[in-house]
Amino acid sequence: MKRRILLLAGGQSGEHEVSLRSARSVLAALPRDQFDVTPVVISKQGRWLPPTETQKALETGVSSQGGDLMLHRAAAAEGYDAVFPLLHGPMGEDGTIQGLLTLAGIPFVGSGVLGSAVSMDKVMTKQVLDSAGIPQVAWRLAVRREWQQTPDAVRARAAELGYPLFVKPANLGSSVGISKVGSPEELDAALTLAFGLDRRVILEAMTPHKPREVEVGILGNDVPVASPVGELSFDADFYDYETKYTEGRAEMHIPARIPPEVSERIRTEALRAFRALDCAGLARVDFFYVEETGELFLNEVNTMPGFTTTSMYPKLFEAAGLSYSELVTRLVELALEER
């Protein structure tokens, strides 16, 4: 008997179009003899589009602004065995949709409310990973009211870290709002930008040498496995929004061109982070590797990484011998497992 799957795509974050591309890939890959898949696109305005508008959005990559607020149908998820919430960033990967589906009592692919929310929030992620002893670059927290009332205190925290440093909104994806700050004179503009997007901001030290950006995929629930390690190479100062989403700006290397013992360290730390953050189903864990010193720093954990056939996460597991179709099938199976 076929399993009925509700595939959610689009969403209100800056990764709306990436989600639509991922959804097209997943729709084509789920075996039709095993699954009956119904896609629903959520517009950038948060409207849940009816079937005809959903199909148009998937075909064109552009969603309409209309549609009904079909929360009652999604919450009931009547007749569906599981939901695949293929949504990235705020209002999709941050525990919000996971809470809705949990209230509805419907199984879904990926981390639950806690794992999704904590992994999306850079402050909470760093605090949990600190407590688990997982290495990260030095960082400080600042909140908007502090910046408005006692800006010198925030500037002092930046001075403690030294320059250059990064300024990052705590709860946004796609590298949106991130600035590289080379001197104290550049700090105020970067903080103003970040605080315009989030009430909490992370100040993050830079490594003394430009690090290599390496990534590993995790698959599983309580007994997860790690993929081979991949590497991203690019000319930009950091992996910003433009580099991330402009074709040809970054190159993917699988396996990463690093010593085997470093790859094993990365895989071990990624599994530790996955468990510490109470993730489930899947995650892509990103690290900085400083070749000159041998240091390794965890950068972030993505609980719903990009999922086109050319995205890093599926490619990592393809290198492990798992085809794209087998991977998405396994994710649905994991969603249906009792946790």
From Swiss-Prot:
EC number: 6.3.2.4
Pathway info: Cell wall biogenesis; peptidoglycan biosynthesis
GO molecular function, one term: metal ion binding
Cofactor remark: Binds 2 magnesium or manganese ions per subunit.
Residue positions binding Mg(2+) 2: 300, 302
Primary residence: cytoplasm
ATP-grasp domain boundaries: 126-333
The keyword Iron appears for this protein: no
Localization, UniProt: Cytoplasm
Coiled coil (residue ranges): none
GO cellular component: cytosol
Keyword Nucleotide-binding (UniProt): yes
GO BP annotations listed: cell wall organization; peptidoglycan biosynthetic process; regulation of cell shape
Recorded superkingdom: Bacteria
HAMAP family membership: Dala_Dala_lig (MF_00047)
Purpose of the protein: Cell wall formation.
Family to which this protein belongs: Belongs to the D-alanine--D-alanine ligase family.
Protein's name in the database: D-alanine--D-alanine ligase
